[in-house]
């Protein structure tokens, strides 16, 4: 299975978790990691190139830190520009039908804060629903996300283990 990881962190060079994830995933021959902020420092996304890349892979992974209960802005811009009517959706937009979409998300807060009654009031599943809705619209199979909670409190060993677990997780088959 060919996997395309779109790593979207505006400060990847100083990131703790997302940088470790990208480095670990890059070690695998069937995984291509693209750092979108490095690829497009001016945010001028090459739509044709991105669409072609998406067509070449079986599974697409959006990797990002949770920013204001969503993704960093470049991922939203990427979706707005790349997932076009007639290509990704609409009566003739079937380029991604049958492919898989997965999210790899890191949060600053602990897991217990992402639930009813928790500090953030909503589960991570609820907060990520727009990605699931997008996946449904464009005919992709939405897979369970990989979430690493509590980056702000994580030990280096936990981060290293999370990178290895992520590599295993995104390569496993989902029925």
Curated annotation (Swiss-Prot):
Keywords per UniProt: Oxidoreductase, Stress response
Xref: SUPFAM superfamilies: Flavoproteins
Induction profile: By heat shock, salt stress, oxidative stress, glucose limitation and oxygen limitation.
GO molecular function: electron transfer activity; FMN binding; NAD(P)H dehydrogenase (quinone) activity
Gene3D superfamilies in UniProt: 3.40.50.360
Known EC number: 1.6.99.-
UniProt family annotation: Belongs to the NAD(P)H dehydrogenase (quinone) family.
Protein name from the UniProt record: General stress protein 14
